[in-house]
């Protein structure tokens, strides 16, 4: 079903004729839903509208002269209207409707014309939208009276405060401007006014929809409305019924926890081995065997599901019955039984939701404390995002019929994957002079693939990936590899001999993922091959072999898939070239090549020939031939599959080998470019740059514009050899310096050339000193969008869960650009504040530094952006100093570093004192300024003595190893820099085979006498060790090596910089700087670097506070066992409570009394309620503490106030008992919290010790039910029946011990 939506500012409809005009216009358009603004309607006019319009009409009036919005439904659109709300009089009308099983929120908006009033309006709109269920779709149309895109207005307009509010609203609620999304380059307007000879045009009328509905949007148009100075904007989108089932079966990994299932699989496969002789080939036997496994899994799942549903139904009936019996009853025993049954039902609901969690791939959701509608909402949004509801045919005709859409997709990919003829001459030209694999590595590649290699490949494969057509997952193969592995190795050995894999391995499901652009164009869907796991095991094993030789045959300027190279090498190079060109006045052209369907157009014949040109052996080439022999794919369109089609061209995206094969395939083209193009040639620094490549993202660097024509010639050779295509019209470039478009060869003038900014590998780069602001605008929008998507989950997630969302799903989106660019402190602070707001959902109870500490140190591990940026800079220094071979950008970095204070130091900067470079960094680009500022935050210790050629490069200035009186003089240092005498080697005269004499030094330093130079030389010589003197004498005698000298990377240790607290720090505190291990900088890990930076950045905040506020009442001694609060048995929200208790992050009576009229007294005993009182000293808690002490004694464990508050350390030898004891402590705090909350809400809570017994018993019974269901009774007994303290277990019964029996039940 298609839905047509329109929006129009009518300029007033009070006149009956104007009303008739508007309604006739809408009928002609055939719109299902129409949003009208500025209607000037009043209640008296409603009858006229209802008589004239056949469908339903909804009004929101203001006055007969201003505002007014009306929403109309056509008579053919009759959804269920759940609510109609006039939110802001005359300006905002909200309809909540249900259609085809989905709920839509239709919002009609008319924004004010003045900036401040408009900003307040958007703030009110945002606040109201927060109340809407995030599970539901948003469709917002109307007159926004503001534009966000410069293309949407004919004359610039001064920005006002409403812009930032509107941008944040759009990002926060993941809204998409449909017309602009489908028409990214078109300029059109919806409002036109001509007055006094001036024309004002803008596109202020827009329709926004939720981003997950974008794939349903078929078209968006602007239609002239003759009676208004506004035009009508319309949207056509599909409304689908409830989602169908998946296109093919997927194995449910939760079955792997069932011992009965595991035994059935192993027994079935052992029996299947007896049927090998009944098949012509092992390939057939393997394929049919996997079908048997699939059927076994499906039958077992049906059986288990039926049993589980029956259990839940029975438990649900018990709870309903207890609810009826509780009506009007005050029977405490009945209440406890109800709570216990209710808790058991909730736990079972949690387990049932796991299937949804697995498909959503968010392990985070597994940590929620209950099954939630949010799980299913997230899945629905993901499913909608992948749905294709309309495609254009080749002639541009829109196709909406599902069968027509499938035919169009299959036809497109059949054409794409069909090979074209290739030119042998072009191939020979490309292959001529290629580097070859060494004989030693070649021999290794030629050996047969072993079972151990397959096993290693399987171990390295990531989890939670979509399976291939057989439905068997990576987890399935890993679990049953001991059974399946040897058989699969035999199948594979035979397959390689015959040159063909089993059919299930040859076939892939082509899943289409949306890209940017109009999703009605099939080319804007990215094909990813979902391959069977057994195929991926083989591909991974071959990939592990191949990666060891890539660096031998692929040039350093291509970094994709080559070990030791990263994408940042490419970005750093282009970034630094731009800065270098601007500083030196170079004129350069940067041309970014747009390659059309690069991975999908690689010709297989060309690929095999290229491998042979690299001198790969026949056995290894045979492996790759077999991997692609008779390959097929089935296109997945929504929830169906097309008929198979031959995969005759391209490398399979989704295959572990695809990236490596593509790098090998494009390398001959890049080699040809390097041979024929001049590129950029520099003498200082000594380097040549022709291109930078990351997979198919190739950017050419040209000083001579003739290089562009040569590049086109090279591309024509490459296209003839491999079927590759470069779309010159979509390629883009940057002209730096004096170059202009008019200077370019005619064929290149139609390319989109910029003079300031180029986007390369996702980063906006320019020659300006500071990064392009667009980078940070997009990052901020990205953060807001991500947090907005998860905002509905926030209160359901634990703090650990929210921290995981922040670190893995939000902050991780900004790291890429922050590694390459220097963000402002304002940007960092703003994003950090957003992240912490999401973590706390209210008051920030502890500082940002404490929140960022890892859990084991008392924090929640929320990433500190500032510390992470410093870590990135330290990692960049690591790569600069120690990368072997050194990336090209390091040469430019050295050139920049040598300009610092004219000292001529590059690597030597990192062994001198920071004062040597911090005073003046203005000669450096902003990125390298930040790098040196970060370096100044740590202390540097050098290991060992300076020996050999390194002594010649030893710096004289600010060098802790060269502490002389003369070198400490500021004047002497300045003169040495001016004279370019900054290293030991600079003081050697190779012509005289001696040290430079005092007279020469005097002249170069500008002194009038030799007294100071003589003394300076003497002090330097006296500082040098005898061994170094001997080496220098040998160098002078031999006359070599002469400058420039090659020095080895500095062997240094980094340590925290010594800092003093302004006052005596408490002990123990949260700072760990004094315990930081001294580590060689070459070997230090990213994790350790981050820890160092985190404690350095937040030093004062951490050293000035105790590790826990409980030090006020509990003496120094044991430390809190932070990780024990979130151990495997403890529910994460319960762990949050224990964590907050230790930090005092709870609203107690004394705290609230400081800010409100709430009483400070404890609601139970009347004494002052601090966190210490509420959770420890209150008289009502003593029976509970006594019960805990008794339980601990029965476990033969020590119980004390420290253990109760701080938790018990988990030891390896006593792990199960320690985990269980920590759970009891966590549940005790939970019942204290719940009973206190119930009391404050006016209830009559059960005693804390009674509620504790109920919770423990309920947990035991729920765990026992799960253990019986999964066949894991032994594990249950080992965990819960320790020493028989809590319960005893038999195959048919779990008996709870007397200590957990409620006292009043015993009395009864």
UniProtKB/Swiss-Prot annotation:
| Record keywords | Transposable element
* Domain Reverse transcriptase: start-end pairs: 494-765
Keyword Coiled coil applies: no
Task: Name a GO molecular-function annotation.
Answer: catalytic activity
Checking InterPro entries in the record gives: DNA/RNA_pol_sf, Endo/exonu/phosph_ase_sf, Endo/exonuclease/phosphatase, RT_dom
Q: Which Pfam families match?
A: Exo_endo_phos, RVT_1
PANTHER family per the UniProt record, alphabetical: REVERSE TRANSCRIPTASES
Listed name of the protein: Transposon TX1 uncharacterized 149 kDa protein
